[in-house]
């Protein structure tokens, strides 16, 4: 009966019937091979693609009911992490965190534990729970990590510190990290603490050579350039404003931020309060396009924490 249900894609009834059979008849000669078949069916549902056709909640419900069938080793870990990714995509962050928390506690060790712990920390940050993010990192410390994974964990720890109100410690945590991800985090910290003189050079690094190849600026590039000139304006960094105007004066006119760019980089004697008003106007936009959002974007093209696997 269980196999018939499975053949009809009724996975819950099928696995339920097979579970009853092996539970009620533990000494039957068919129990051992049937148990292996049940475990394989569970694996195939979640790895072979059938679970992808379910809603994330239905997939989670099926997993929770038959969790004991999760294979040991990498295939089982793959099931858990894939399900967690799907839950994150629909903002079921608490449920995703619980899955990975169990994985950290009971399934993985060493560098793999550190990697999954970083994923768990990221979910907690996305869920606005920085203390839990720090706890996840502390619970998954392991020696001998690769440089990429160690740096990613460091950035997550810095983000959690900042979200808990300790901007200085967060900046110290990443002071040796020269990566773009670290600069995005620095820019966000300086922006939100209104440390304009410190923000401007970081945004300038992030802007880099955008638009110098003759291509038009997309909205994201234009916003990054605007954040640079807002920071430079608020810190009265005329050198940076002149550089930005010379480099991007023409190309920024064709973007939604052209008027703001013109005000920030122009030679007029506008009231400084206009600059402050504009900076506040774009503050929330600047924050959205920052550290955590870059991770959310990566969910669309790969598994959660893809940047923490090195």
Residue ranges: model-predicted function:
Residues 1-310:
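Acidic, polar-rich low-complexity tracts and alpha-helical solenoid repeat scaffolds
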């Amino acid at each position: 009966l269980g196999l018939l249900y499975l053949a009809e894609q009724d996975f819950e009834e099928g696995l339920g019937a097979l579970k009853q059979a092996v539970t009620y008849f533990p000494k039957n000669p068919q129990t051992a091979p049937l148990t292996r078949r049940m475990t394989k069916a569970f694996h195939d549902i979640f790895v072979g693609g059938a679970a992808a056709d379910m809603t994330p909640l239905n997939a989670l419900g099926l997993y929770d009911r038959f969790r004991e069938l999760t294979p040991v080793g990498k295939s089982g870990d793959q099931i858990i992490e894939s399900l967690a990714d799907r839950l994150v995509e629909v903002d079921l962050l608490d449920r995703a965190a619980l899955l990975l928390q169990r994985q950290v506690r009971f399934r993985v060790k060493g560098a793999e534990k550190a990697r999954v712990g970083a994923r768990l920390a990221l979910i907690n940050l996305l869920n606005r729970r920085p203390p839990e993010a720090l706890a996840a990192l502390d619970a998954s410390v392991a020696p001998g990590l690769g440089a990429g994974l160690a740096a990613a964990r460091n950035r997550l720890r810095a983000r959690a510190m900042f979200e808990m109100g300790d901007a200085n410690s967060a900046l110290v945590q990443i002071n040796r990290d020269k990566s773009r991800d670290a600069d995005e985090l620095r820019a966000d910290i300086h922006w939100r603490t209104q440390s304009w003189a410190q923000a401007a050079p970081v945004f300038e690094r992030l802007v880099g050579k955008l638009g110098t190849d003759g291509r038009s600026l997309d909205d994201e590039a234009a916003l990054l350039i605007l954040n640079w000139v807002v920071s430079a304006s608020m810190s009265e960094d005329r050198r940076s404003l002149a550089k930005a105007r010379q480099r991007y004066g023409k190309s920024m006119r064709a973007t939604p931020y052209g008027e703001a760019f013109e005000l920030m980089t122009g030679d007029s004697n506008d009231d400084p309060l206009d600059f402050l008003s504009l900076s506040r106007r774009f503050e929330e936009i600047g924050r959205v396009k920052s550290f955590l959002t870059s991770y959310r974007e990566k969910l669309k093209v790969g598994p959660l924490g893809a940047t923490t696997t090195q």
